[in-house]
């Protein structure tokens, strides 16, 4: 039987909320999976993460994570400082997910989320920088057993991956079993 999941953003607009409340709500409603924004993991204490992890296990809810990468951490950026900062930021998130026994992250995490403030006639350089970054990030995902999924989105969310074909081409250029669409 297919497992069913729901994203906390169905109920919440902010990322800073009572995660335990929604784990229990998802369980009560018959869901098997609850997806959170990944960024708040960086602000949580380990004891709070332990509490969330325990409640999820008690309620038989698998936690998955998603991310719309802040442009300040754009791993496709031509600014090397921003790109390197993005790599470290995403590696820290994957490490925290590993601590939470999280197995899947998805979303726009291969470039800054949102349409760039400029026209992109040729995105190949951005794609190459993103791929270069992802080859580093995916090593951390492999170390923590995390599947790193890329999401094809419309041109107003990213110019890097807009079609299923582009998503497949992207993951095929990363030598890892831990990257998916």
Regions found by a protein language model. Name each.
Residues 3, 24, 33-34, 128-181:
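Acidic/histidine-rich catalytic cores of soluble enzymes
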Residues 97-119, 144-154:
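Active-site groove signature of glycoside hydrolases
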Residues 14, 44, 83, 113, ...:
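Residues in flexible loops and secondary-structure boundaries
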Residues 71-77, 113-120, 156-157:
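A short acidic, helix-capping loop that chelates divalent metal ions and anchors anionic groups
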Residues 1-102, 124, 135, 142, ...:
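N-terminal pre-domain/capping segments
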Residues 84-87, 120, 124-131, 161:
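Short, amphipathic alpha-helical segments
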